[in-house]
Amino acid sequence: MRKLTQFCLGLMLLPIAAVAQNQPTMKDVLGKYFLVGTALNSHQIWTHDPKIVHAITDNFNSVVAENCMKGEIIHPEEDYYDWHDADQLVKFAEQHKMTVHGHCLVWHSQAPKWMFTDKEGKEVTREVLIDRMYHHITNVVKRYKGKIKGWDVVNEAILDNGEYRQSPYYKIIGPDFIKLAFIFAHQADPDAELYYNDYSMSIPAKRNAVVKLVKELKAAGCRIDAVGMQSHNGFNYPNLEDYENSIKAFIAAGVDVQFTELDVNMLPNPKSFGGAEISQNYKYNKELNPYVNGLTKAAQKTFDQQYLSFFKIYRKYVDHIKRVTVWGVDDGSSWLNGWPVPGRTNYGLLIDRNYKVKPVVKEIIKLYE
């Protein structure tokens, strides 16, 4: 009798399990309009943990490296490239039939230590830095030619006030380092899409500067397919009207738009904090970490509303939006737990710490059905 009862219960549960497995995911529905991506860290690209693998492959059809393709990791010494993790990222994507985007070729932060100085520690000349930049871009892009759909060629070269960042690339080469980087990347893989990527893109001064840059690159004959709006957003920012105006401005400038590093910081920020400048670091303060045991109902509602607001905007411009990438797989592995304040518990992504899709995802999917 007990076996019969267990058998009957099993039959009753089968349809429920089947329904759960057949629920449409983001990649199933949103993927009809644009690529749905996530950033992978070095643990995730090597893992065999089925929970992590399924969280990635069930929900996303595109991946990008969180760190392993950045200069200091992939090219730590002038005559040595470390392809170990980057190759595995591409292999993981190929195994699971996912698209790969490359991040990033030229960035002032996490650049190789040797890039800007000679053996005596003196600043290199313009000619030397151009040559080093050329070889770095050429070797990295050619290695993954035909395997990577597109590259963030230059990352974060413009400040929030619209001026050029005074990076070593800018100081040594001048503003044309951006144009040269796009030329070198295109020469290395003529079929790869090329992007300019930056944060705080809803700020009007920054928006205008990026539009100007796009037009200058196009006038110079450079290939630039899209602007990447990183979208490291928060529970009370950005201003949605400004955010949408930037989308419209970039489209009007003749390029597509990609949302390349989407997350929603649910924690209060230090008073002087702004943007997504990775060099900003602050001491831990428990007042800045209010949700150690989970979001309150009010905070969860705000989280849901923010994500729904962004995806409602994206829905309006699907003809010009080619990719939306969330910056991380799950809350537990998100960079937001350690930046800009270390040791916090944040909830900025669409998959929770148990690798379960959050309820708001169903509402996002409904927007596109």
Swiss-Prot record:
Superkingdom of the organism of origin: Bacteria
Pfam families associated with the record: Glyco_hydro_10
Signal peptide, first to last residue: 1-20
Reactions that this protein is recorded to catalyse: Endohydrolysis of (1->4)-beta-D-xylosidic linkages in xylans
Keywords: Carbohydrate metabolism, Glycosidase, Hydrolase, Polysaccharide degradation, Signal, Xylan degradation
Any one GO molecular function term: endo-1,4-beta-xylanase activity
Functional pathway: Glycan degradation; xylan degradation
Active site feature: E156 (proton donor), E261 (nucleophile)
Domain GH10 per the UniProt entry, residue ranges: 21-367
InterPro entries reported in the protein's UniProt record: GH10, GH10_AS, GH10_dom, Glycoside_hydrolase_SF
EC id: 3.2.1.8
SUPFAM superfamilies: (Trans)glycosidases
GO biological process, one term: xylan catabolic process
Keyword Nucleotide-binding included in the entry's annotation: no
Signal listed as a keyword: yes
Record-stated family: Belongs to the glycosyl hydrolase 10 (cellulase F) family.
PANTHER family according to UniProt: ENDO-1,4-BETA-XYLANASE A (PTHR31490:SF90), GLYCOSYL HYDROLASE (PTHR31490)
Protein name per UniProt: Endo-1,4-beta-xylanase A
Organism name: Xylanibacter ruminicola
